[in-house]
Design a protein with these regions (language model features):
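Conserved SAM-binding loop
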Residues: 101, 122, 187
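Conserved phosphate- and dinucleotide-binding cores of soluble alpha/beta proteins
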Residues: 2-12, 18-24, 30, 45, ...
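HTH-adjacent hinge/linker in prokaryotic transcriptional regulators
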Residues: 2-9, 15-23, 27-30, 38-101, ...
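Glycine-rich N-terminal segment of FAD-binding domains in flavoprotein oxidoreductases
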Residues: 104-106
Length: 268
């Protein structure tokens, strides 16, 4: 990632939270701690943020607090072939008539293309996913209510009793900030709250992550590994990551990017 892109992500992140730690910024930019500290120092000298102990803060915080994490437009360009292969493998699990939940994200957005030939009942909190499927498929679409967070292209409701409680699915598809021994990780408490509600509404949880996500870490844990039914990832997954999932009883499906379809295998 180029310096200009890293600086854009850092400045976006500090507008979203009172203080952003160096560790969080490393995860967002996929840069080393030393590089991240140099970026913070450079932006501090340019008076674009304020360097604080262990991280950075905004000089003029935004009145509307957004979500922590990389913007959708930046994530969309990263690991694109892997995401497309993962999405094809995920839709192979779906039959016509299935009820599914799709959590917003750039990997899950790739589901829209293979889903065009399906007829499923789909609940999503992603405006781009809903819009595309409405235009280009015969799936039945339900959209969650709430505020639209523009940079992540996701809709989150501040209310506990919303339409989410009225939809139950056979399977939920979602991405993540990171995946490790302690479980599935996310970048923002608001995402955690919304996604936990969705997870409760599905029998199976299918996590779509490219292999880089096994290296990412966050301080916020969404759910433990044993709540995950299946992980679909690309063929760069390490033996260590595959063994970690297998030990937790998680099925692993490896999608071959560039091959038109998946190669499957059980992690246990």
């Amino acid at each position: 990632m180029h310096e200009k892109e890293r600086h854009g992500i850092i400045l976006s992140a500090v507008q979203d939270r009172p203080v952003v730690t160096v560790a969080d910024l490393c995860a967002l930019t996929e840069a080393s701690e030393a590089t991240t500290r140099r970026d913070i120092a450079a932006l501090h000298l340019q008076k674009k943020l304020r360097r604080v102990r262990g991280g950075a803060e905004a000089i003029s915080p935004a009145p509307f607090v957004g979500l922590a994490g990389r913007p959708f437009a930046i994530n969309e360009t990263m690991h694109a072939p892997e995401k497309q292969a993962i999405a094809r493998a995920a839709v192979d699990l779906c039959d016509d008539g299935d009820s599914i939940i799709i959590n917003g994200g750039t990997t899950t957005f790739q589901l829209v293309h293979p889903l065009a030939s399906r007829r499923c009942q789909i609940f999503t909190n992603s405006f781009p996913i809903a819009e595309h499927l409405l235009k280009h498929s015969k799936n039945t679409i339900m959209l969650s209510g709430g505020a639209i967070y523009r940079e992540q292209n996701i809709i989150l409701s501040p209310f506990d009793n919303d339409v989410t409680r009225n939809f139950y699915a056979r399977r939920m598809f979602m991405g993540a900030q990171g995946l490790g021994p302690i479980g599935l990780m996310e970048a923002d408490p608001l995402l955690i709250q919304a996604e936990q509600k969705l997870i409760h509404q599905a029998d199976e949880l299918v996590v779509l992550v490219d292999s880089s996500k096994f290296e990412n870490r966050s301080s916020l844990v969404l759910c433990p590994l044993d709540r995950i039914t299946t992980v679909i990832t690309d063929d760069k997954i390490t033996d260590k990551a595959a063994a970690m999932l297998g030990a937790a009883g998680v099925e692993v499906i490896v999608a071959q990017s560039g091959a038109g379809h998946k190669e499957g295998g059980a992690g246990a």
